[in-house]
Amino acid sequence: HPTSLIPLSWSMRSYDLDVVVTRGAGIESRHRVHAAVVDSSDRLIGTAREPETVTMWRSCAKPFQVMPLLASGGFDEVGWGDDELALASASHGGEPEHVAIAESMLRDLGLEEGDLACGPHEPLSPRGARIVRDAGARPTRLHNNCSGKHAAMLARAHFSGWTLAGYERDGHPVQLAALQEVSRWTDVPEAKIIRAIDGCGVVVFGLPLDAMARAYARIAVAVSRGDEIPTRIARAITTRPFVFGGSDRFDSLVVEQTNGRVISKVGAEGVHSVAVFELGLGFAIKVEDGATRAQYPAVLHMLELLGALPEGLSPKLADYARARIRNTRGEVVGELLPASA
């Protein structure tokens, strides 16, 4: 693939990447970014700061967590399709369309909202949050951005004859199957993967950043080969970008802007993983201080360096690339910008 698109500095030394917060002509704050870029041969070809730094994969692991359900045949047995698969892989915005799919998934299993182990939170999408407020309602577990993943995990337990209670807990067969899948794609032995509790209650995996990039590079390669399970996941995400994120959600906009040539997966605390299909690449970043506001400019900056973005970002995606900072009068007083050395 065209490695000439990779900055020479990445193959020679660590590429120091920051996202700076400006105010006027000055820099007010600085977010340090760690990154790893892996190619189709599993080679680490680009780094920013400490590519081996260990952190939690958070929601970036979702495409791998749903793989055991697909492999078991349970997904097809219940008759689900691309909408359900996109939602199971998503950090969705909690809009009515997302809630309806999650509710339908539970209904197909003979289950209800109370069977979900995730707690409720306000929809991540401003549209979704506004709809809940205007209805005078409270968010439910279905609005949780991980409700699709949880429904898929319940399906895995249901069709395997495992107990549904505690499906989210470390040691449950559902979580052990996910651990095995993560280990297989990252090449990190199960015993060396840190296990903790994610924001939604399921097991979360801690591993090196370059291992995360390796897994997403392998997804890109597997899709190019036509491997069934990765291809089905990629097809669901790229043909259902709204389900995968929502109105103006970053992951959805990246899929749309690149016509499905790139899959971007957001995670909490400034972690992000990306597969670039045409280049057979995967990369992962971690904003050191966990600031979400810094991860989007960093991801878009790296996609630009790799030549993976078309010329001329859509206005909505451009807002993520250089987020404007406004004061209480609505005046633009600064912005977030990627800066490298």
Predicted regions located by residue number:
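Residue-level preference for non-acidic, small/hydrophobic
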Residues: K62-V66, M212, G280
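Active-site SXXK
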Residues: W57-F75
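Bacterial peptidoglycan biogenesis and beta-lactam-recognition machinery
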Residues: A71-V78, G110-G114, S160-G166, H172-I193, ...
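Structured C-terminal helix/loop/strand segments within mature extracytoplasmic catalytic/sensor domains
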Residues: A217-A341
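Beta-lactamase-like hydrolase cores
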Residues: L5-E52
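Active-site-adjacent helix/loop patches that line small-molecule binding or acyl-intermediate pockets
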Residues: L5-M12, G81-K192
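Short glycine-rich loop/turn motifs
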Residues: R30-A35, A151, L179, E269-H272
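A short glycine/serine-rich beta->alpha loop
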Residues: A48-M56, A88-H92, A135-N144, A196-V203, ...
